[in-house]
UniProtKB/Swiss-Prot annotation:
Solcar repeats lie at residues 14-103, 110-195, 210-310. This is Mitochondrial thiamine pyrophosphate carrier 1. Belongs to the mitochondrial carrier (TC 2.A.29) family. The keyword Repeat applies. The gene is TPC1. Induction: Expression is regulated by carbon source, with very low expression with succinate, acetate, ethanol or pyruvate as carbon source. One of its GO terms (molecular function) is thiamine transmembrane transporter activity.
């Protein structure tokens, strides 16, 4: 067993190809264990409040409906663009974080502020690079028919009906959301790691395990806090991604709701959801998201640090 290093710390200098590869590994690992939860979460976000049973039974309602009407394989709908999304996003996020970390270190920002700023830039970069895969995944997951949609067909439909902007529908909102998420996640992660490092020598021996537990939970804590704060923005973005779909009326019993979004921007759609469905609708799927966030962020950070450790041997 090796001592876990913090290769994301201010001043760390890791080769670009190593951060790119390690980020891809961490993204693929995270995706492999969370795909079914991701599918349920997106289905919940895309369904207006009046379309489901009370909050406590929403997850089971969606899961039972999918198994009954679409089969068990439906939990992996959109898995190819989803996997490409995670790999691309993970590679871009960690490699750009390392790059910005290197170039912003000379500015002498306080360590916690440095992590927050670098995390924001990494979030913007990874969002832009991976966003078309996110749009494809959302539309493929929205398919509630037994037969899966062709990825190439969906790409052609988006290009034909919406052009290049169709692949970036809601991208500005996404950059805002992901920038906040990355800033909060990396900022919290580094704050906890720095706190643990600073208190390691002064902590009593019988309380060392508490510090170690906190240290190893840094990524998970950061992910949970970020998800709670930004989840409403993600819900609005999902609806923007789906509202212009060619298959809207076929895949959704609530096409009239989406029709009311036509011509609206991010803020207007958010206000429309609040007015017609209430604030709880913006948090539809939050329990699944948090359940997914814990393993995702843990595996993501652990996978990245582990991959970097072994790549440093070469």
């Amino acid at each position: 067993m090796f001592k876990e290093e913090d290769s994301l710390r201010k001043g760390q200098n890791v080769a670009a190809w190593k951060t790119l590869l390690a980020g891809a590994v961490s993204g693929l690992l995270a995706r492999s264990i969370t795909a079914p939860m991701d599918t349920i979460k997106i289905r919940l976000q895309l369904t207006p409040a009046n379309g489901l049973k009370p909050f406590g039974s929403q997850v089971m309602e969606v899961a039972r409906s999918m198994i009954k009407n679409e089969g068990i394989r439906s939990f992996w709908k959109g898995n190819i663009p989803g996997s490409l999304l995670y790999v691309t996003y993970g590679s871009a996020q960690f490699s750009s974080y390392s790059l910005f970390n290197r170039y912003l270190t000379p500015f002498g920002l306080e360590a916690r502020l440095h992590s927050l700023v670098v995390g924001a830039f990494a979030g913007i970069t990874s969002s832009i690079v991976s966003y078309p895969f996110d749009v494809l995944r959302t539309r493929l997951v929205a398919n509630n028919q037994m037969h899966s949609m062709s990825i190439t067909r969906e790409v052609r439909d988006i290009w034909k009906l919406e052009g290049l902007p169709g692949f970036f529908k809601g991208s500005i909102a996404s950059m805002t959301t992901i920038t906040l998420t990355a800033s909060i996640m990396f900022g919290t992660y580094e704050t906890i790691r720095i706190y643990c490092d600073e208190n390691e020598k002064t902590t009593a021996a019988h309380k060392k395990w508490e510090l170690a537990t906190l240290n190893h939970s840094a990524g998970t804590i950061g992910g949970v806090i970020a998800k709670i704060i930004t989840f409403p923005l993600e819900t609005i973005r999902r609806r923007m991604q789906f509202m212009n779909s060619k298959h809207l009326e076929k895949f959704s019993r609530h096409s009239s709701v989406y029709g009311s979004y036509k011509g609206y921007g991010f803020a207007r759609i958010g206000l429309q959801i609040l007015k017609q469905e209430g604030v709880s609708s913006l948090y539809r799927g939050i329990l699944v998201a948090l359940s997914k966030t814990i393993p995702t962020t843990f595996v993501s950070f652990w996978g990245y640090e582990t991959a970097i450790h072994y790549l440093r041997m070469y």
